[in-house]
Structure formats: structure tokens, C-alpha cells
Amino acid sequence: MVDKRESYTKEDLLASSRGELFGPQGPQLPAPNMLMMDRVVKMTEDGGKYGKGYVEAELDITPDLWFFGCHFIGDPVMPGCLGLDAMWQLVGFYLGWLGGEGKGRALGVGEVKFTGQVLPTAKKVTYRIHFKRVINRRLVMGIADGEVLVDGQQIYTADELKVGLFKDTSSF
């Protein structure tokens, strides 16, 4: 039985990274340091811009986060690719929440725009994922648009985020 709540704590997300949240066949989130959220604050099957599902999650920003020490020395900024990866993570998490099974793999993105940055002085990053379609056949795949906000201001958008769940990744 899938653990289908509307919100999840950091402990829940860590359980997902160990394969304990959505069962032994469900997709896993990455473990820290690659886990790019502290909590999921909202999940619905019928919300979002397209009425086909919505996920909202948050990451607390502190100056001691690992990436600020190396990207870049003297000019610390969160790598934009980590925000993109967080959106892919949330698409896969949603597929597990729906009961999908398999190993999650990012399959692509249509267009990404960066119009701002996450600095060590920020307080919170918010991720919003708006599902356009979920395909549940031999391949389970989610297609969604996403946005990243820092302290309430939109700084990234991504169209056509795609994540698939694979029962066998040996030929992927």
C-alpha cells in the first residue's frame, strides 16, 4: 500500500531515499547531499495549472550548504542544475506517490530558463511542479512544468520535465 499523504517531512524523504516509503519496488529519492528538498508541503492528483497533479516542496537555505563552499569560491551560488534536478526528483516522487513502480530516471526537459540565483543569504527555495500528463503503461512516465522560487520570487522555469520509472535499467 502506498503511503499517500498530502505532505512529507524530511524524515519521510530520507525514508524514501532508503526505499522505505513507497515499498521495495517504488522509486527512491536520492540521499543527501543530492536530496534537494527538506519537505513536501503539498501533493494533489488534481491540482496545478493543468488540473492533473501538483507538488510543492521546500529547501531551507543556510550558508553552510555543501555547494556554497565549492561553487564558486568567493562567489557562492547554488548551481542551477541542482534546482533542475530537484524538479526531476519531485516528478519521480509523485509517480511513486501514485503507486508507480520502478527506478526513476530523468528523461529530459524541453526548455529551462534561469532568471535569478540562490545565494547563501536566501532563506528558502520553493519548488512547484504542475503535471501535464502521467502515462501508466509498460513505462510509467510523468510530464510536468516546474518553477523554482527563492524567498517567494520565481528564478527558474522548466517546461516538459520528463521522468520515467523502469523495472529494468540494464539496457537504459
Swiss-Prot record:
Q: What is the reaction catalyzed?
A: a (3R)-hydroxyacyl-[ACP] = a (2E)-enoyl-[ACP] + H2O; (3R)-hydroxydecanoyl-[ACP] = (2E)-decenoyl-[ACP] + H2O; (2E)-decenoyl-[ACP] = (3Z)-decenoyl-[ACP]
Which InterPro entries does the record associate with it? FabA, FabA_FabZ, HotDog_dom_sf
Could you name the active-site residues?
A: H71
Pathway(s) the chain acts in: Lipid metabolism; fatty acid biosynthesis
Q: Give the GO cellular component terms, alphabetically.
A: cytoplasm
Q: Where in the cell is it found?
A: Cytoplasm
What GO biological process terms are annotated to this protein in UniProt?
unsaturated fatty acid biosynthetic process
Q: Transmembrane segments in this chain: where?
A: none
Question: Which GO molecular function terms does the record list?
Answer: (3R)-hydroxyacyl-[acyl-carrier-protein] dehydratase activity; trans-2-decenoyl-acyl-carrier-protein isomerase activity
Q: Which domain of life is it from?
A: Bacteria
Give the EC number(s) under which this enzyme is classified: 4.2.1.59, 5.3.3.14
Which keywords accompany this UniProt record? Cytoplasm, Fatty acid biosynthesis, Fatty acid metabolism, Isomerase, Lipid biosynthesis, Lipid metabolism, Lyase
Similarity annotation: Belongs to the thioester dehydratase family. FabA subfamily.
Quaternary structure note = Homodimer.
Q: What does this protein do?
A: Necessary for the introduction of cis unsaturation into fatty acids. Catalyzes the dehydration of (3R)-3-hydroxydecanoyl-ACP to E-(2)-decenoyl-ACP and then its isomerization to Z-(3)-decenoyl-ACP. Can catalyze the dehydratase reaction for beta-hydroxyacyl-ACPs with saturated chain lengths up to 16:0, being most active on intermediate chain length.
The protein's name is 3-hydroxydecanoyl-[acyl-carrier-protein] dehydratase
Q: Which organism is it from?
A: Pectobacterium carotovorum subsp. carotovorum (strain PC1)
